[in-house]
Amino acid sequence: MNFLNESQTLWRDTVHQFVEQEITREYIRKCDTERAYPYEGYAKIARAGWLKLLIPESAGGDGGDIFDYALMCEGTGKFGFDFATAVMVSTFTAMNIVHHGSKEQQEQFLVPFMEGKSRFSISISEPQAGSDAANTKTRATLENGQWVIRGQKLWCSGAAADNVVIAMLVRTGEGKSKHEGLSVLLIPNNTPGVTIRRLPTLARRATGTTEIFLDEARVPESAVLGKPGQGWSIITEHLELERIAVAAAYVGNAQTAVDDALRYAHDRIQFDRAIYEFQVLRHMLADMQTQVDAARLLVYRAASLAAASTPCTREVAMAKLFASETLQTVSRQGMQILGGHGMLPEADMERYFREGMQSTIGGGTSQIQRTIIAKSMKI
């Protein structure tokens, strides 16, 4: 793989500087503490033009590649993965609309998204359909030119925010396997019959994780993305982008966890010297930085392969697996280094730790990633 060229280095530095100065760790901490969606931060990202980074120029976007996007996600995840989630989850559906949406859908949804006036959420999981996502029970039937939807969805990120269109996986028919007969419907979150409840989760407190109840909710027949029955291929097509993006954001958050722990180790005086002078702390910090650097390289490799349209299912799974477990590990070690101070919200480490705990679950569990890797090894 090639390491960053001059323009990529400039772009990465620009994102990090923007997040430090315009978003700030204090703002992200406040959103987390108050369980408040980061509307102001999201709007700043939109005004900077970054929401249209991946959108093709033909659709009014910048036509950037997935490597550029990974660098952006690394930066937006700097002070917490949750903020990056607000940006990423919208982009995943936007790209599905780019690839599969009708001309009318692209005109209706993409321009407001790029301007930051609307956002997207993805709804796949259900109470009995997590990793086994094709076991979808939520059903949509076509009645008098409308899809009538009944069921329940779970673990939907950002669905309760204002002006959200939900890309929802539903069952519209039957087939030889459970992967057939699935469709994706674009459902505004203020649709009558749609009830959304924020869940009091350990992590992702700002963007919000929700459950959705659908009681004969109705949307036009034209709300289907692509064609009926194409849902499984559409919803899984974005997984490569999603896993590279979240892995990059994990790396950004993990690096800050190391930086914060290192700064504390310099400032904290015990037994008449800074605690970093104790070898046990130096070794902990050395291991933490090594893990983050290794995770970053795996992410950059996966992103560079994807940008070159090279098959990289295995490399993407490795990046997601290692980056998520790295965030979990270094945030836990950061908590140990900060001691009692780490338990306080203003230290931020406890937020990184909470995000680290969900990182090995969301976007495909570590066990699923290992299964993908093992399959690529023919074992």
Regions found by a protein language model. Give the residues of each.
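Active-site-adjacent elements of ketosynthase-type condensing enzymes
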Residues: Q128-K137
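A short, charged helix-loop
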Residues: T210-E237
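Helix-loop "lid/cap" segments that line or gate small-molecule binding pockets
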Residues: T91-H100
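A short core secondary-structure module
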Residues: Q146, R150-T195
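Alpha-helical interface subdomain recognition
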Residues: M1-F79, F83, H100-Q105, P112-K117, ...
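Flexible, small-/acidic-enriched active-site or ligand-binding loops
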Residues: N135, N190-R218
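Short Ser/Thr-interspersed hydrophobic loop/turn segments at strand-loop and sheet-helix junctions
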Residues: G49, M72-G77, V170, I187-P192, ...
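A short, Trp-centered hydrophobic/proline-enriched beta-strand micro-motif
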Residues: G116-I124, M168-L169
